[in-house]
């Protein structure tokens, strides 16, 4: 009986030690998971705050933009493939400030309308998409805008390996006062907009302004730096 009692006591002690260790291990695991969940929640909260701040920023931009344009028809939706309100507001402010005689835009859309409504005199917009180019033409017609030429042609392969706007659409371009680089889309090539440096920057007028969209991307920042080096006396926005 004494032996049984001793064995029972030993087993009970072993079981107790096992349970204590298991509980401690579980506690550590719970703490690790809690830390991970806390970090994930903190990250999500930060992203949500950032997105809300951007939404508010874009709302402020569209509120400031609309009174500047005096539109006679609805403004198409922005964001997504279309230009963001803050970018459109920049276009409006710059155009009203410098009053360009000749504007070249890479990638047509709502931005084309904003340029025209802000006082750009002659605008040529290059677009590789028949769908988007046609939509822009219809939008301009709805707003009774004139003096804008939408040149639609699929992207063309260049010796450098890039696919860019067709050479035929570049004929006659010279003394560009305002250059908007917002195409081709990066889906065609991460450096899809880089050929503008070679083919359009040399065609700028002495006091031209260059506006480059999507500069949060590495490729666009690289292009911006290259343009700054090529044109130290020009303005890059």
Regions found by a protein language model. Give the residues of each.
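Class I SAM-dependent methyltransferase Rossmann-like catalytic core
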Residues: 62-98
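S-adenosyl-L-methionine
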Residues: 137-175
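Single-pass membrane-anchoring alpha-helices
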Residues: 1-28
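Conserved SAM-binding motif I beta-strand of class I
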Residues: 122-128
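C-terminal substrate-binding/active-site "lid" region of AdoMet-derived donor-dependent transferases
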Residues: 154, 185-237
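Conserved SAM-binding loop of SAM-dependent methyltransferases across substrates and taxa
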Residues: 110-120
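Conserved class I S-adenosyl-L-methionine
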Residues: 98-109
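Short alpha-helix immediately C-terminal to the canonical SAM-binding loop
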Residues: 133-134
